[in-house]
Curated annotation (Swiss-Prot):
<dbReference type="InterPro" id="IPR041367">
    <property type="entry name" value="Znf-CCCH_4"/>
</dbReference>
<dbReference type="GO" id="GO:0003723">
    <property type="term" value="F:RNA binding"/>
</dbReference>
<keyword id="KW-0677">Repeat</keyword>
<dbReference type="GO" id="GO:0003700">
    <property type="term" value="F:DNA-binding transcription factor activity"/>
</dbReference>
<keyword id="KW-0238">DNA-binding</keyword>
<protein>
    <recommendedName>
        <fullName>Zinc finger CCCH domain-containing protein 23</fullName>
    </recommendedName>
</protein>
<dbReference type="Pfam" id="PF18044">
    <property type="entry name" value="zf-CCCH_4"/>
</dbReference>
<dbReference type="Pfam" id="PF25512">
    <property type="entry name" value="zf-CCCH_AtC3H23"/>
</dbReference>
<dbReference type="GO" id="GO:0008270">
    <property type="term" value="F:zinc ion binding"/>
</dbReference>
<dbReference type="InterPro" id="IPR000571">
    <property type="entry name" value="Znf_CCCH"/>
</dbReference>
<keyword id="KW-0863">Zinc-finger</keyword>
<dbReference type="GO" id="GO:0061157">
    <property type="term" value="P:mRNA destabilization"/>
</dbReference>
<dbReference type="GO" id="GO:0006355">
    <property type="term" value="P:regulation of DNA-templated transcription"/>
</dbReference>
<feature type="zinc finger region" description="C3H1-type 2">
    <location>
        <begin position="165"/>
        <end position="189"/>
    </location>
</feature>
<dbReference type="GO" id="GO:0005737">
    <property type="term" value="C:cytoplasm"/>
</dbReference>
<keyword id="KW-0862">Zinc</keyword>
<dbReference type="InterPro" id="IPR045234">
    <property type="entry name" value="Unkempt-like"/>
</dbReference>
């Protein structure tokens, strides 16, 4: 230890062993989140959980309302180019705490976005392991004997960075969200649209969290909410969100938006086949602006706008 070095470092440097020593997919995994006080988490970020604070160094790699962060940082600090390279949806879903860290020297894993042997925040690659975005009930109790072969998510990051969850639903606070971590979409550009078909190997994901801060713990293992899902075409949804965003700024989305989805292992948007709802057509999101997907007709636009207006007025 160097002279003058603080002995009470919050994140002490650890020696990272070789990956092969503990790379056992069937090993029993203990839950790092089983001891989290849910009451304190629900007040986050105003009353943050001491456990979640241990991951504070990773917050810069996790999603939030970038619009608010940009305005807050305009007074002085500029975002690091290194951090910007880690802020894409592709990296967060398929690389964050999944790709093995290539650094040879010992370092603090709580400050590194890559995976290390035995660390608590490690994630399974959803492209290789078929598990859903639903929290594992056994893991929430403390451990899961199935380990990496489990069909459910283990921990906060596996749940909320799962491709079927991450930014597939709008944040109820919209652009007014000021939470340090938020896995929901704050603008239509952030919203990830998934095909409306269910993959039985991956299961379903539940609706919008009951509390905006409840996303900081693993979602409970419970059936989806009873409120009926909105079922217009995806193009109508995007266009309606644009209208609400232009009219109300940071509008509040009061009702959960759920859908059974098939997990595409890419953050790029893919063609959506016609489903059981009327007035839905195939379209390519990558080739045309979202506003062009709305079918023409004053009645359809008026109906969609009135529906969203009624739902938001109830909140």
């Amino acid at each position: 230890m160097m002279i003058g070095e603080n002995k009470n470092r919050p994140h002490p440097t650890i020696h990272i062993p070789q990956w092969d020593q503990i790379n056992d997919p069937t090993a029993t995994i203990s839950s790092p989140f089983s001891s989290v006080n849910l009451n304190s988490v629900n007040d986050y970020p105003h009353s943050p959980s001491p456990y979640l604070d241990s991951f504070a160094s990773l917050f810069r790699y996790l999603p939030s309302n970038e619009l608010t962060n940009d305005s807050d940082s305009s007074s002085g600090d500029e975002s690091s180019p290194l951090t910007d390279s880690f802020s894409s949806d592709e990296f967060r879903i398929y690389e964050f705490k999944i790709r093995r860290c290539a650094r040879g020297r010992s370092h603090d894993w709580t400050e590194c976005p890559f995976a290390h042997p035995g660390e608590k925040a490690r994630r399974r690659d959803p492209r290789k392991f078929h598990y859903s975005g639903t929290a594992c009930p056994e893991f929430r109790k403390g451990s899961c004997r199935r380990g990496d072969s489990c069909e459910f998510s283990h921990g906060v990051f596996e749940c909320w960075l799962h491709p079927s969850r991450y930014r597939t639903q709008p944040c109820k606070d919209g652009t007014s969200c000021r939470r340090r971590i938020c896995f929901f979409a704050h603008t239509t550009e952030q919203l990830r649209v998934l095909p409306c078909s269910l993959d039985p190997d991956l299961g379903f994901f539940s609706g919008l969290a009951t509390s905006p801060t409840s996303i900081l713990v693993s979602p409970s293992f419970s059936p989806p909410s009873e409120s009926p899902p909105l079922s217009p075409s995806t193009g109508e949804l995007i266009a309606s969100m644009r209208k609400m965003q232009l009219n109300g700024g940071g509008c509040s989305w009061s009702s959960p938006m759920r859908s059974a989805v098939r997990l595409p292992f890419s953050s790029s948007l893919r063609p959506i086949q016609a489903a059981t709802w009327p007035r839905i057509r195939e379209f390519e999101i990558e080739e045309a602006p979202a506003m062009e997907f709305v079918e023409s007709g004053k009645e359809l636009r008026a109906e969609m706008y009135a529906r969203l207006s009624r739902e938001n007025s109830l909140g």
